[in-house]
């Protein structure tokens, strides 16, 4: 999977056999949409359905316009009971409203992703979601931690932010199952489930629109930013980044913000 933004010369990429691209704004919104599914304890399929929907409705952009009074990532309408305009423009709120409606359908886990999206949206173009399914499934798998070492990025921005800000989405999604500790520019995520640690790192990396990162680790794998190329994940140099290697049962991951 990858994301790119030529205008700002800032890129993000994820590879799962092939490239799936999103730009930084899109990947940030994808992280929030996926994080809300994790927070609610929903399976990865729910995130894939929501991402498919937002890709079709808004191209994963939190737009303040649309058909009639439609707004936001999912083009929800205040006049149809989705919430106030201010609420709908909050990606966390709009994602939560989408999932709340999705799970009302008893067959949402068995019908196609396109059809599940259509049940919620009731679009005049009922097959329009289908073309987004491969991209949405790839990102959902990576951001929920089910596709290891999948996310990479290039960020040439000169802007910086705190690692606390970068990790905010992951913390909201995964606390208290994943412990978080900040030391200087580095946030460390620790849990007994490696999938959750991978999700925390991926959600933080997908938030790079807030500021660039320098490096990341998950257990015995590591990644370091390259200003010219999409860096690959590889074996961590030196001692393992994870206490699990010494038999404690705990797994750690880190993300370090560029300072």
Please give the residue ranges for each predicted region.
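Single conserved hydrophobic/aromatic residue that forms the stacking wall/gate
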Residues: 1-7, 11
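Peptidoglycan-targeting cell-wall enzymes and recognition modules
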Residues: 13-21, 58-113, 117-125
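Solvent-exposed, acidic/flexible segments
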Residues: 22-26, 30, 42-46, 66, ...
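Extracytoplasmic/secreted envelope proteins and their assembly/folding machinery
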Residues: 27-34, 47-50, 73, 92-99, ...
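Short, functionally critical alpha-helical segments immediately adjacent to catalytic or ligand/cofactor-binding
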Residues: 34, 44-60, 119-121
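Catalytic and binding regions of secreted/periplasmic enzymes and modules that target cell-wall glycans
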Residues: 93-162, 183-187, 216-221, 246, ...
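Extracellularly exposed regions in secreted/surface proteins, prominently low-complexity, repeat-rich
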Residues: 139-149, 206-259
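Flexible, glycine-rich surface segments
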Residues: 151-199
